[in-house]
Amino acid sequence: MITLPLLLLSALNSLDIQIVSRTENSIQLKIPFADKILEPVNIGFIISPEYPVYECLETGSNNPVEIGPPVTLKDYNLYPVILNPVAGIKEFNLEIHFSKYQDIKLPHSLAQVFKNLILNYEYNPETKPQGLLIITPNSFYNAVLPLADWKEKKGWKVTVARLSETGASATAIKNYITNAYYNWNPPPEYVILVGDKDSVPCFTVSSNPTDHPYTTIKGNDFLSDLFIGRLSVANVNDLNTVIAKIINYERNPYTTDTLWFKRTLMVAGNYPDNQMTTPIPTKRWVREKFLNSGYYQVDTVFYPPVSNGVTAVTNSVNQGVTFVNYRGGIASWSGWDRPSFYNTDVIGLSNNWKLPVVTSIVCLTGNFNAEPCFGETWLRAGNPSNPKGAIAFFGASPPTTHSRWNNCLDFGIYHGLLIDSIYYLGPMTYRGKMEVYVNFPLETSPDSGSEFYFNAYNLLGDPSLEVWTDVPRNFIVNHQPTIPVGTNQFSVQVLNSSSQPVKGAMVSLYKKNETKEVGFTDANGIANFQITTNTPDTLFVTVTKHNFKPYCGYAMVNNSAVYVGYYNHTISDAGGNNNGEINPGETINLTITLKNFGNSTTATNVSAKLTTDDPFITVVDSIKDYGTITPGATANSSPFVFNVSQNIKNNHTIKFNISVSSSQCNWNSALRLNAKAAEFDYQRCYILDGGNGILEPGETSDLTISIKNVGGLIGTNLQGVLRSLNPGVSVIDS
């Protein structure tokens, strides 16, 4: 069977699949179908990752196309559409009819994974990162805070929860995560467990340790609703090492030697005596993809001929590589069998800050039930000032896995990285798991099918880590170095090293307990913010973008003798519907309260002017007098007045500028208000032809269309016009 990109449908949707035309012809398969063969038992033929379909079993049906059983993803059902290669169809046209339109909304983390797997989904690349939940034993709490602080400054909404808050059992922790998922704003998209399984428990599935069940919140299936990783450490010293690795990898990457950013290492072990020959072809495929993506050096250590891999692997890792990708057939919890490389060899590395991501697609090496397993050794190696080993490790805990699933998993991880441009570690490795599901949607057994592999492979590391795929570039960032208390607007300009604007850079402003704003730069490299600065302190400014070294700066918020600015406002729409909101066609009375945030000087002869360049707003009464405002005091005036266009859209943001003048100085404040309007989405249509509900050639039918008001205002006196864009269809009554 061939699985198309997945279809994403809500639980209320229905769909119809129709073969419009087809040419029936026998197809000569290049290689036979693979059986479920356990590594390292004889397979008998080579499977190229270019043809994953041939690793799949036929559906057992003569139907050329089928819909597989759904699984749940967030608020939607996910259906695989399966084409059966043994049905004898060489060419076909496939039409998929949706009886209900769905505006699909996925958080940034899941959107990365599914953007090229779902037919009816349009990816929005600037969705902001959301929640990060760190769960830690009480004894590790203080050691975790530097990581939480860095992530917070980057723009994440970080919560650090002690086991004394979550509960100490796996069930209690899962319940805590579930509650956060449903009730927090924003909900966590990433979860970091801090400690080995003796510190933070895991689940056991098919007798193997796994963290995957923590991620399955919605539905009765095995798909993740969020991403998880474990900093599997045994003590505070190990934890300090791992956190130092993560922070420095993201914030201050090693650039004394930049060649390591474009080097990787492929390690594979075939077993020709058992005719297990797929690992090396799989690694050659991944190697080719790296080279095609601009990597100039992709080392290989293959068995045969290399049996003892210590020297070759050590030399490559010490030179510096960004990824180490192993695919083999025999391993143990302490390392790879062929080419051999074990825990003691990891300890002997000296790669310092040139830390790779290790993906170990083989049995046992990620079994964190052992102490320490191979993956834990890579993660913990070194110390905070002289690290070595890896930044993260992705591997399996069970003692047995199968080649045809492992090959798909390996392929999917690096397809996600190199083709789909998935750079966050949790989504990148989960893309590998989804490749397993895409190729085996009908084989989902928890003991041997897709579900088994979702549980089998776990991430030892930070799932929110953004990996490097090129030599880091540098920003030039411009912003005010100091601002007075009371300032409520702040602009950041982001340029590259050639002084050209950088579009799409994420800018985070963070002032403890007061300001947390995240935005993206526009085509001019500018990000504008409305902020709160009621007290003196440091406003941290952090700018990030993939393959740019983060800018970590700040502006000092200082007291001033006198500073008058926006404090609060009230809206009156008594001449409209009197709901206290800005709606189409209304006249708004806007009362703005100003405050003197200064600490010593009275502001006199204060006046303010309200302006906007918004095409939907006309300010008709724009200038107001406020008189005298003493330090720390507030003052009101009569309302400003503006008219709202009938054509304003729902959730449209109106940007006002408040120019304040006085005998002492002039200032500017920002004010942003949202409008509410009716907004209608197409939902579904019904073809009332008295027959099969399908509009067919020569047929005249009634058409009923259902719409939904997804806006913030009741819609009244609605009218609709129907037009046909198909020359073969005429609308009689429009």
Segments (PLM) and residue ranges:
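Sec-dependent N-terminal signal peptides
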Residues: 2-10
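Cysteine-dependent hydrolase recognition
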Residues: 11-551
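Low-complexity, acidic Ser/Thr/Pro/Gly-rich terminal tails and inter-domain linkers that flank the onset
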Residues: 472-480, 559-584, 672-698
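Short, solvent-exposed loop/turn segments enriched in Ser/Thr/Gly
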Residues: 486-490, 584-591, 635-638, 652-655, ...
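Short edge beta-strand/loop segments characteristic of extracellular beta-sandwich folds
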Residues: 491-497, 591-595, 704-708
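Short acidic, flexible loop segments centered on an aromatic residue
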Residues: 506-512, 595-617, 708-732
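Intrinsically disordered, low-complexity Pro/Gly/Ser/Thr-rich segments with frequent PxxP/GP/PP motifs
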Residues: 519, 524-528, 618-648, 730-734
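Terminal connector regions
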Residues: 543-556, 641-679
